[in-house]
Amino acid sequence: MARIASVNIPDNKRVVVSLTYIYGLGPTMAAEICNKAKISKDKKVKELTDQELIGLRNIIESEYKVEGDLRREVTLNIKKKKDIRCYQGLRHIRKLPVRGQNTHSNARTRKGKAIAIAGKKKAVK
């Protein structure tokens, strides 16, 4: 397995597909990186030479924010929104959907498990 951006990418898959295993790289960016490195998109990772792998590593490290750096940036952005108490920050604090989704009937994933309401017991007749 080749190691790029501290991620083991699978050898038996095409380069474009393997690069998408790295957090922050999707299919479009992976294709763009292959074009910059002058590597065929149909080539498999195990067929790459050491020079091609080094070229891929250099391009990804110098031009793109991936893995730990990207995760850190996202969490800092969320923390900043929470600190300034903007609408999105408040939604994050309350653990509700942030981007305008309905919450009346859905949003169970974001809100967590349904909480039972303790109400009156029905009177026995």
Swiss-Prot record:
A GO term from the CC aspect: small ribosomal subunit
Q: Coiled-coil annotation: which residues?
A: none
What the entry lists under Pfam families is as follows: Ribosomal_S13
Which PANTHER family does the entry mention?
A: 30S RIBOSOMAL PROTEIN S13/40S RIBOSOMAL PROTEIN S18, SMALL RIBOSOMAL SUBUNIT PROTEIN US13M
Q: Could you tell me which HAMAP family the record lists for this protein?
A: Ribosomal_uS13 (MF_01315)
What is this protein's function?
Located at the top of the head of the 30S subunit, it contacts several helices of the 16S rRNA. In the 70S ribosome it contacts the 23S rRNA (bridge B1a) and protein L5 of the 50S subunit (bridge B1b), connecting the 2 subunits; these bridges are implicated in subunit movement. Contacts the tRNAs in the A and P-sites.
Q: Kindly state the subunit structure of this protein.
A: Part of the 30S ribosomal subunit. Forms a loose heterodimer with protein S19. Forms two bridges to the 50S subunit in the 70S ribosome.
Q: Note whether tRNA-binding occurs among the keywords.
A: yes
The record ties this protein, via InterPro entries, to:
Rbsml_uS13_C, Ribosomal_uS13, Ribosomal_uS13-like_H2TH, Ribosomal_uS13_bac-type, Ribosomal_uS13_CS
- Per its record, how is this protein called by name? Small ribosomal subunit protein uS13
Give the lineage: Bacteria, Pseudomonadati, Pseudomonadota, Alphaproteobacteria, Rickettsiales
Establish whether keyword 4Fe-4S is in the entry.
no
SUPFAM superfamilies in the record, alphabetically?
A: S13-like H2TH domain (SSF46946)
- Molecular-function annotations in GO: rRNA binding; structural constituent of ribosome; tRNA binding
Its gene is: rpsM
- Its Gene Ontology biological processes? translation
User: What's in the keyword line of the UniProt record?
Assistant: Ribonucleoprotein, Ribosomal protein, RNA-binding, rRNA-binding, tRNA-binding
- What family name appears in the similarity comment? Belongs to the universal ribosomal protein uS13 family.
